[in-house]
Design a protein with these regions (language model features):
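Short secondary-structure boundary segments
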Residues: 110, 135-137
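N-terminal catalytic cores of NTP/NDP-binding nucleotidyl/phosphoryl-transfer enzymes
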Residues: 4-33, 38-43
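N-terminal Rossmann-like or analogous alpha/beta NTP/dinucleotide-binding catalytic cores
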Residues: 19, 44-130
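Short, charged/polar "capping" segments at the starts of alpha-helices
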Residues: 47, 138-144
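Generic structural signal for alpha-helix starts
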Residues: 87, 144-145
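Short, flexible hinge/linker loops that cap or flank conserved catalytic cores
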Residues: 1-2, 98
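Conserved small/polar residues in nucleotide/adenosyl-binding loops
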Residues: 147-149
Length: 149
């Protein structure tokens, strides 16, 4: 284990949660030697159409069932208790305050990476966390020019 606690956050509607979500966090844990992954269900993403089918309690329960074999996965309802819209920056500030000595990572898909410059106050967010970007099998490689936010 490193000198600092390494924590990654995966936010999303998780409606429904699926094997891909768990595969991603397992891969991130393995590749980066993460100590913890926080699954952060949101009320409403400002970047997606949100017509959720499952309610908040059901989505948290789905996450709990999907992750119960992994003691390094934590489910946080913090964002569910915030006002809309739900910005990643506010969650990053919260977790930086909660874990001041930790190195924080934010897991996103290539679809969101392509829109990263439209995220609320992205410059401050990028100072608080390091992005982990996953691509789907058939997606083209990352546009690394976006790294210079």
């Amino acid at each position: 284990m490193s000198e600092f606690t390494k924590i990654a956050i995966l936010g999303g509607s998780f409606d429904p949660v699926h094997k891909g979500h768990i595969q991603i966090v397992k891969q991130a844990k393995s590749d980066l030697d993460l100590d913890k992954v926080i699954l952060l269900p949101c009320q409403r993403s400002p970047h997606k159409d949100n017509n959720t089918i499952a309610n908040e309690r059901q989505r948290v329960e789905m996450l709990s069932l999907a992750s119960n074999q992994h003691d390094w996965i934590e489910i946080s309802d913090w964002e569910l208790n915030q006002e809309n819209p739900s910005y990643s920056l506010l969650a990053a500030r919260h977790f930086k305050e909660t874990y001041p000595e930790a190195i924080l990572y934010w897991i996103i898909g290539n679809d969101q990476w392509k829109k990263i410059t439209t995220w609320y106050n992205i410059a401050e967010l990028a100072e608080l966390i390091t992005f982990i970007v996953f691509t789907r099998d058939k997606e083209c490689p990352l546009d690394l020019s976006l790294i210079h936010i």
